[in-house]
Amino acid sequence: MYIRFFLIVALFCTFTTYAYEVKRIRRHIQKPVSPTKDSFYVPKEGWEKAKPGTILASRKIQAGFTERRKIHLDGAYQLLYRTSGVDDKSPSFTVTTVLVPKNARTNKLVMVMPYEDSNFVDCAPSYKIQLGAPNEVNPIQSVEELMWTSILNDGWILTLPDHQGPLSAFSSSFIHGHASLDALRATLNFDTLKLQPDDPIVGIGYSGGAMAGGWAASLHDSYASELNVVGWALGGTPSNLTGTFRGVNGGLFAGFSVAGIAGLVDSYPEVNDYIGSVITPAGNDALQYTREHCMMGIVVGLQNVNMTLDSFVSNGNTLLTDKKIAPLL
């Protein structure tokens, strides 16, 4: 009992200290613009003709967690790049954030696919990582920052893709995989880093990031075989989306099942039509909720929601067995 009490107090003090440090730093900086309002996230006309991995725009940024954790960087950059959507014939685009530590080892690259787990565009890692962004510090993100910090302190160049794409399509497998692989291409193409095309690469992901990593690993040979990926480290991987949906639906983390459906609806017109034909107003409200809240908001706001109830859809337990959606799971 006492151990639990002191652990809670320690976590509270740590988080409070971080929050105070962020507040102190924010007094001296300009708040970043959210992706829905930032023109950087919109490629210029003709971008579709570029090859996957082509850099469409770049900029320097300030990263919030490196300021708080006193990590000294040579530079922090964001790259808008061409990628592919649900197949390699569907042009798309997204952003990756590249962090370069002091005295970086310029012959290796590490990619971490953050667990965004939300359908809200303004929850993109590239936005939340920027100094001064709302919700820049929260308990879940702070845990992931520990891994980023360790990688940077070891001297590795780190790239963090917005692997859910421009619509933040959580659970849309091919979008996750393509965006991750093309983030590597774009990072290698960024001349400032002086990386070489055959430099060894490691990909890391947990939870929603592991889903992206799993699909990137699966698509590597067919989509981006030139990349010298020497290993993947993935944990908490939702490898079977149907099983994951059934496991979390109606429980504490039910919001993830709703977000997963919303991601497929936003990616595939046929799924949009199918779900539109069976969903109720309450179900539609639940989907929309995931497009307006970040991960913690989804977990709290949609706790215990059961998407197979008649109040949400008209076809209950057969929701995911229809031929329009089953092959995508």
Name each model feature, range by range:
Residues A19-R105:
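Catalytic-loop region of hydrolases
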Residues S90, R105-V110, D154-T159, D198-I201, ...:
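Loop/turn elements at helix/coil->beta-strand transitions in domains of secreted/extracellular proteins
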Residues P114, I129-L167:
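Conserved alpha/beta-hydrolase
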Residues F170-T192:
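Alpha/beta-hydrolase active-site loop
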